[in-house]
């Protein structure tokens, strides 16, 4: 670039920063803050599938799946992980179905969690926007998009037609929210339900509610599915769960995480450590016995998991080594690396 152009560019940049504030325009390579801060999801497998060690701050995230697939559990696990890092979280309960007892069992500090149960969709989204603009909230969860009912629909008659009303409301909200979330470095997670498109002969008939705006504005989209039941004898004690990263703007997409959600406990972290440890040769398996560093830790997976629950320092070491192996060095050294929360041994 010639000297006159450089002077003109410097003057323009100076004017823009003077008018709109420092950092309103920058060279991409100069800005260290472009490294995206993340929060662990509570599942090591999912953190690895996301490629960044967790979900990104300052972005919109969409979580969708069938009923009882673990969508709310995933967000509550993330809230618990964020609270352990000293972050402030809010839960916009549009479905009016949040169970504080279950949230507490997953490790959520319910005394510190901000909860809103809005009357209309517009009210819920205005609350989200106000919290984002405050700069004091780190994580927000909206459960769920399907329950964000426009005011006109609530005040109208039961049979009235409101074509595209919710989609227009969400599209406008996304335009307002995106910039405010980035400026305040606040993550907003929207939980979505699945619907079936009528008359689809070929291809996938599934779609999500609320139009297409959220799909475009979301930096990460997660598809969570229940793939089987975990039984102890005849009693079902949890779900086998598959989480697919459908969209990812911070790392490579289309990766999958297979994990277990135990009723009343959340993600089976110790089970993930055993499975991933064996896969990547950190944990040795000989017959039914599992060993780590030459020491036997249990006969059968259940006993190995119990050992890791009782010896949290061993679990933390395996967790840290797996993150160092499977994530980039900068990501693996994050605050969530190696932290294994204590589980409450309660029946759900």
From Swiss-Prot:
Stored SMART domains: AAA
Disulfide bond positions: none
Species this chain originates from: Vibrio natriegens
Pfam families hit by this protein: RecA, RecA_C
Record PANTHER family: MITOCHONDRIAL DNA REPAIR PROTEIN RECA HOMOLOG-RELATED (PTHR45900:SF1), RECA (PTHR45900)
Keyword Plastid part of the UniProt annotation: no
Family the entry assigns: Belongs to the RecA family.
A GO-annotated cellular component: cytosol
UniProt entry keywords in alphabetical sequence: ATP-binding, Cytoplasm, DNA damage, DNA recombination, DNA repair, DNA-binding, Nucleotide-binding, SOS response
PROSITE patterns documented for this protein: RECA_1, RECA_2, RECA_3
Protein name: Protein RecA
Compartments (UniProt record): Cytoplasm
Function statement: Can catalyze the hydrolysis of ATP in the presence of single-stranded DNA, the ATP-dependent uptake of single-stranded DNA by duplex DNA, and the ATP-dependent hybridization of homologous single-stranded DNAs. It interacts with LexA causing its activation and leading to its autocatalytic cleavage.
UniProt xrefs under InterPro entries: AAA+_ATPase, DNA_recomb/repair_RecA, DNA_recomb/repair_RecA_CS, P-loop_NTPase, RecA-like_C, RecA-like_N, RecA_ATP-bd, RecA_C_sf
A GO MF term: damaged DNA binding
